[in-house]
Amino acid sequence: MKIANAVRYAGLVAAVTGLTAVGLVAVGQVQAQPAPLKIAVMDGFSGVYGDLTAGEVEAMQMAIEDVGGKVNGRSVEILSADHQTKPDVGAAIARKWYDVDGVKMITGLGTSSVALAVRKISQEKGLIDIITGAASADLSGPACSPTGAHWVYDTYALAQVTGDALVKAGGDSWFFLTADYAFGHALERDVSAVVKAAGGKVVGGVRHPLSTQDFSSFLLQAQASKAKVIGLANAGQDTITSIKQAGEFGIVKGGQKLAGLLVFATDVQSLTLPVAQGLVLTEAFYWDLNDETRAWTKRYRAKKDRTPSMLTAGVYSSTLHYLKAVQAVGSPDDALKVMAKMREMPVNDVMTKNGKLREDGRLVRDMHLFQVKAPSESKHKDDIYKLIATVPGDKAYRPLNEGKCPLIK
């Protein structure tokens, strides 16, 4: 099996220092430099999720810059690889990184099946994974880990914020179009629970393979169901394709609503506002939310000329918090001590205010409900959302005692 080549980035080179005398140092002796701290980002950099994950390495670079380029005197080196949305590929990369390359932390990990596979290896090795891309709430439930974190969003929060809002707006009957792997199944499960709890009903559903090109048969079933809402429990190019083809079938014009249950700003830009206008969705980050997000985005665009997604911002946030914790502990070698420090320290950065990393690994943060603007409301190509509501983290995320995490007694 061919493992994707690592793309390496060394943390900012610190200014060369003069020799420091410790006891008697021979003239001309060069002080040994400590080995770099190696961290890594693994994601679906090609294929169905490629557009979402572009820029994650640059986001990690920004986090390294924001701790001064070094941690406890050590430079920071980034490794990067594409897991191709295949759990076996992701697992092989993780093992090599941990066993051969000496990586101390892996982040990214979009695609829940890959994240679950890497989580097992990280736990086995006693090393840290911070999952920013995968959505399955099982990652802070049955698959929680003492050295694992689930950082940006999960299926429970997406269901709670988007699903509840649509049911309250009258969308009380649902049909699901679901990606047939762990993420899609978890999202359908969690949204169904919210719909039923709010007094709605699920009238049916159909599952599709990852990277489906033709959704016609699935959309015809959804149309025939007469459900008020068609829930799209998929992501990336699958979401884009299904929304475009739903438009061709006249589904929205016929009175049914589409619920994009995991939609990113990059998806909306690919769809264009005439196609996506009116779509209600949940995100943890939007570049135009406030002055701080706008300033961060300007800095990011100097490295990567594109609109950052919440995945990009999430990789920045996870990396920054990890590096701060390592700095505070003094070493990355004891993962349990680093994780304890990460839980102790509140998370405060461009996308999170007073976030709390719980014992089950769930980062509790505020989530934002947006609606896609109509073309007439948009001032420029990146002006795509209007804020409907901000939901506090303790309302958006599953209560600690309900997740079935074996670490919680």
Spans of features found by a protein language model:
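Short, low-complexity disordered leader/linker segments with a strong preference
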Residues: 1-38, 404-409
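Short beta-strand segments enriched in small/hydrophobic residues
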Residues: 35-52, 173-177
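Solvent-exposed, acidic/polar segments of extracytosolic/periplasmic ligand-binding ectodomains
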Residues: 37, 346-409
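Beta-alpha junction/loop-to-helix N-cap segments that form part of ligand/metal-binding clefts
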Residues: 51-58, 66, 70-141, 151, ...
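Venus flytrap/periplasmic-binding-protein-like
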Residues: 83, 137-140, 210-211, 252-276, ...
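Extracellular/periplasmic Venus flytrap/periplasmic-binding protein
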Residues: 92, 137-140, 145-249, 285-295
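Periplasmic-binding protein-like
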Residues: 97, 101-110, 130-132, 175-178, ...
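Extracellular/periplasmic periplasmic-binding protein-like sensory domains
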Residues: 243-318, 327-333, 376, 383-408
